[in-house]
Structures are given as C-alpha cells and as structure tokens.
Curated annotation (Swiss-Prot):
Naturally occurring in which organism (per UniProt): Pyricularia oryzae (strain 70-15 / ATCC MYA-4617 / FGSC 8958)
Name the record gives this protein: Glycogen synthase kinase 1
SUPFAM superfamilies, per the entry: Protein kinase-like (PK-like)
Induction remarks: Expression is regulated by MPS1 MAP kinase, particularly under stress conditions.
This protein's UniProt keywords: ATP-binding, Cytoplasm, Germination, Kinase, Nucleotide-binding, Serine/threonine-protein kinase, Stress response, Transferase, Virulence
One matching Pfam family: Pkinase
Gene3D superfamilies cross-referenced by the UniProt entry: Phosphorylase Kinase, domain 1, Transferase(Phosphotransferase) domain 1
Domain of life: Eukaryota
Length: 394
C-alpha cells in the first residue's frame, strides 16, 4: 500500500513524479504507474478529484480519492470494473493509500480525464443569454441514453444522473457518464434507500420515499436534464422534497390515486391539492413536437409508463443524429470548424441484444455494412441471453 498521504498531492513540486503500485482497472493485474502535476478539479462529501499527467505518456488522467470503509467492499470500484462502454468514463487503474490518521485508508480510482461537463456547457450558453443548440441537446441526451441502456441491461442503476456527472469532450462532442459512487445493482424485492439522487433530478417515487424503485429513476432524471438544457434552468427546482413535489405537480398536475399507488402505495389516502397539468408545449415554448413528445414520455408519474433508455434512443427526436449528412457546428467559436458527429452507432453484441426487435430502428442503414463486417449482421443476429447480460459482483 502506498505511503503517500493525501497531502502529497498538494505539495508536489513541478516535474516531481509519484510512483504507485496499482491494479489494472480491467484485469486487476499489478503494475507500476507514474504521474506528475496534480491539481484539484473537484471535491465533495465523497472525497477529492485530481487532474494528473501520467508519465512517461504525458496522458491526462483523473484520480478520484475516497475514504475506504475497511468493513465493506467499495461498490463504486466493483461496478467501474464491470462497465466498459464508449459513453462511460473508463477506469484505468486503482490503488490504496494511507491517510493522515493511522486508521485511514483511501481508495484511488485512476480514470480517463475528460475536460468539460454538460453543467459547464449549459452555464456557458446561459452567460451568452441563449440556450444550448438543439442538435447538441440531441447529441448529449442520446449518448446518455446509450450509456443508461447498457448499464440498465446489466441491472445497474446509476442513481445520480445530473449535468455535473456528464463529462464532455467539447472538441469531439463525446459524452461520458461518470461518478458511480451512488450506483447499485438493483435486485427485485430487495429494498433500496430512497434518499439518493440530487435534488431537481429526483424521480417522484423517491420523493415519496419508495424503496422498491427501478432503473426508471435514471430515465426521469434524464428527462429533467433534457428539459433543463432546453430551458436554460432546472425544470423542477426546490430546496426540499415537498418543494420539488409542488414544482412537479405544477407541470404534470396532481397524480391520480392509481399513479400514487405505482410510486408508493402508503400515500394513496393522502390528500393533495387538485391542480390541472400545464402542457409541456407551454413550459418549453421553443421545443418542437418531437421534443415535447419525448419529454412527456420520460416525465411520467408511473415508472412503468416511462420509456426505457433503449426505447428513448429510437425516438424520432434523435432522427437528425441518424442522418449521415448531419454535421456538428462549433457553437462556442464564431469561426469554429463544422465537424462530423462522434461515433454513435458503434454498437457491440451486448448493446444489440438489449432489444433486438428495435435494431433496425437503432442502426441507421449507412452503418449496417460496418457492423456486418465486424460479424454483427442485424438481419441474422443471435442476441445474448438476458441473464448473461446481468452484472455479477465478486
């Protein structure tokens, strides 16, 4: 175990190299890792995130350092070692180090570094007194759904979808989901805590204290993020759960007894103020019919009525992305180059097995020859068994 204390990060001299024995993020094999130039780029209740340069490759990396409770396996590490996807931040390696106090042990997750977040991108457009271009909203929300379709098919729920956890490479337009600190494999009939997910993005069943929720809580959060990018501000702000519920009711109207039953039956006899719904086309005045239709299908009170992530991907709102002639303008710089869209359809066998009946909608015709050349012919495709797709922890 490394003797480097957390403070070592703060006292690094220019050019000084730290050497660690680490375990590979995929294989678990022990190897040497060297890095230099650390600066704090994020901190919170979980710990600290540092930006570093790996040596000798000079490649940027992020090290997330969290206090490790020795009594438990770290769920974030277990899940990060299982997930491998182009829209999920990659775990390169991990190692343990001692803290300031005698008993303290820190887990260090060495991850790829991605320079921007959807939150910061949204703030940029706010400062410019405008909203994010709709093509960018489509691009980012589609990639988020692609990441969610993958983890949900494994039985994993992220439980903290918000703009701050969506990393962005502004030069390529690639989005990567990060921070699996709240993620969990949901098992049917096993209770889960309801006090997860950040305010503004919490599904109503969580506000109602449900403990038997599903991966559809991530779908609700994604609907909130999508609406926020189009509005330039959170759709359901509120300092408390009650505040948020009031904001949701102001838009969706009062839930029916049946809808309340699907969220948490304990509240069925509760009397709520009777409020009529406020149509989404009045809330999102600039949005077209496809955007309104998608948001309405994501922000449903009844969890089973919400679209699944894979179903959302084939929604007509994303048709522009499937058009081979669509280009991505540089919305940050007046003189910027128009670019190709990043890879959005480089599906693997696992992804094509999630809902094989949708593959002809999911894979645009111009991409099919490329996939077929890799042995993934969607006309003659044998999907993986659902049970083989589920994640298993050691």
């Amino acid at each position: 175990m490394s003797q480097n204390r957390p403070a070592a990060f703060n006292t690094l001299r220019m050019g000084e190299v730290i050497r660690e024995k680490v375990q590979d993020g995929i294989t678990g094999e022990t190897r040497d890792l060297q890095y230099t130039q650390c600066k704090i780029v994020g901190n919170g209740s979980f710990g600290v995130v540092f930006q570093t340069k790996l040596s000798p490759s000079n490649e940027d990396a992020a090290i997330k350092r969290v206090l490790q409770d020795k009594r438990f396996k770290n769920r974030e590490l277990q899940i990060m070692r299982i997930v491998r996807h182009p829209n999920i931040v990659q775990l390169k390696a991990f190692y343990y180090s001692n803290g300031e106090r005698k008993d303290e042990v820190y887990l260090n997750l060495v991850q790829e570094f991605v320079p921007e977040t959807v939150y910061r991108a949204s703030r940029f457009f706010n400062k410019m007194k405008t909203t994010m271009p709709i093509l960018e909203v489509k691009l980012y929300i589609y990639q988020l759904f692609r990441a969610l379709a993958y983890i949900h098919s494994q039985g994993i729920c992220h439980r903290d979808i918000k703009p701050q956890n969506l990393l962005l490479d502004p030069t390529t337009g690639i989005l990567k989901l990060c921070d699996f600190g709240s993620a969990k494999i949901l098992v049917e009939n096993e209770p889960n805590v309801s006090y997860i997910c950040s305010r503004y993005y919490r599904a109503p069943e969580l506000i109602f204290g449900a403990t038997n929720y599903t991966t559809k809580i991530d779908v609700w959060s994604t609907g909130c993020v999508m609406a926020e990018l189009m509005l330039g501000q959170p759709l359901f702000p509120g300092e408390s759960g009650i505040d948020q519920l009031v904001e949701i009711i102001k838009v969706l109207g009062t839930p029916t007894r049946e809808q309340i039953r699907t969220m948490n039956p304990n509240y069925m006899e509760h009397k709520f103020p009777q409020i009529k719904p406020h149509p989404f086309n009045r809330v999102l005045r600039k949005a077209d019919n496809n955007a309104i239709d998608l948001i309405a299908r994501l922000l449903e009170y009844t969890p089973t009525e919400r679209l699944g992530a894979i179903d959302a991907m084939v929604h007509p709102f994303f048709d522009d992305l499937r058009n081979p002639s669509t280009k991505l303008p540089d919305s940050r710089h007046q003189t910027g180059q128009v670019r190709d869209l990043p890879p959005l359809f480089d599906f693997n066998r696992h992804e094509l097995s999630i809902a094989p009946q949708l593959n002809h909608q999911l894979v645009p015709p111009h991409v099919r020859p490329t996939l077929a050349a890799q042995g993934l012919d969607i006309d003659h495709f044998t999907p993986m068994r659902k049970e083989d797709m589920l994640a298993r922890l050691d």
